[in-house]
Amino acid sequence: MSITEANALADAPGTRNFTINFGPQHPAAHGVLRLVLELDGEVVERVDPHIGLLHRGTEKLIEQKTYLQAIPYFDRLDYVAPMNQEHAFCLAAEKLLGITVPRRGQLIRVLYSEIGRILSHLLNITTQALDVGALTPPLWGFEEREKLMMFYERASGSRMHAAFFRIGGVHQDLPPKLIGDIDIWCDAFPEKLDDLEILLTDNRIFKQRNVDIGVVTLDQAWEWGFSGVMVRGSGAAWDLRRAQPYECYDEMEFDIPIGKNGDCYDRYCIRVEEMRQSVRIMKQCIAKMRAPDGQGPVVIEDNKITPPRRGEMKRSMEALIHHFKLYTEGVHVPPGEVYAAVEAPKGEFGVYLVADGTNKPYKCKIRAPGFAHLQAMDFICKGHLLADVSAILGSLDIVFGEVDR
């Protein structure tokens, strides 16, 4: 049959596009995503993401909890890099309270935020490789992620849902042995990253599956509300750590990698380079924590906001009362509204917090970067082949905890 005959047949009455379900049980669907794809042969005509399968009512639940009890809910949003979400909520509450975190507390926060970034990017680039047919990278990536999760566990007692950040600082100081082990890991990791790059970066098949796939121009990225790697891949050096520095990021030396084509391959390359920059930041944090001015408390020493030390509690009745009040009633945040955002691994993670002067948030609106990225699936995938859908989805880096909340 000639092409002319085939086109005539396609235009004939009675022919229609083919509709298929992608997920929620699909191995490349990254959790509970369901896409309804409308296909013309192998070409994608329309993508309809169905979300809500992991909806837990997080924003409403937070309204019923004290500020301290709200922190663990943030671990369960982007559960690949939990501490980064806690960071945004704590920054919002600290802005309303008008407090500044002690320097050592800031350094620990930055250190663990960068560990979270590597955790997220490692999972993303290795599973993106798996989506396009490479089986080895995930095995190597999970080996490194296991070591990082051990650092999470040694700091907070939990591998994933850490609940380590506190309003005013962090839960507790890091032991010197842990800081030393993180330092040793930072020295060894770039070599592991080189091994991953040898497998993927110049791999002919990997490039064929990613180059010129899912192209997003910079104007389109701004129009769709993209942030993070999705914007940097299109050529804008927009990073909240540099544009609106929080904690001690203004002291850190690091580069912001940007792409020029805005395709899946550029986004992969940026994530690899961001992991190298995260290691640089972690090394600087460790050096600053070991310096004399990096010593001191890790949480603000105000018993109206943070609990007293256990030793003090056993000696002072007043300290015991403070402890009891903080854990039963919680801290009262002055009335006001504030927006605080951090550069999470997936983009700008923001918290819009409204306080009414009580011990519970009046409203906590969560701005998840993955939500804006997922809604553009239809626009990005249109005209691509069915096989490209999983490559595009992988490069968007969607985690459903934060999309559905």
Curated annotation (Swiss-Prot):
It catalyses: a quinone + NADH + 5 H(+)(in) = a quinol + NAD(+) + 4 H(+)(out). SUPFAM superfamilies: HydB/Nqo4-like. It comes from the Bacteria. It is found in: Cell inner membrane. GO terms for cellular component: plasma membrane. One of its GO terms (molecular function) is quinone binding. Its EC number is 7.1.1.-. It is a peripheral membrane protein. Keywords: Cell inner membrane, Cell membrane, Membrane, NAD, Quinone, Translocase, Transport, Ubiquinone. Transmembrane segments: none annotated. NDH-1 is composed of 14 different subunits. Subunits NuoB, C, D, E, F, and G constitute the peripheral sector of the complex. NDH-1 shuttles electrons from NADH, via FMN and iron-sulfur (Fe-S) centers, to quinones in the respiratory chain. The immediate electron acceptor for the enzyme in this species is believed to be ubiquinone. Couples the redox reaction to proton translocation (for every two electrons transferred, four hydrogen ions are translocated across the cytoplasmic membrane), and thus conserves the redox energy in a proton gradient. Belongs to the complex I 49 kDa subunit family. This is NADH-quinone oxidoreductase subunit D. The lineage of its organism: Bacteria, Pseudomonadati, Pseudomonadota, Alphaproteobacteria, Hyphomicrobiales.
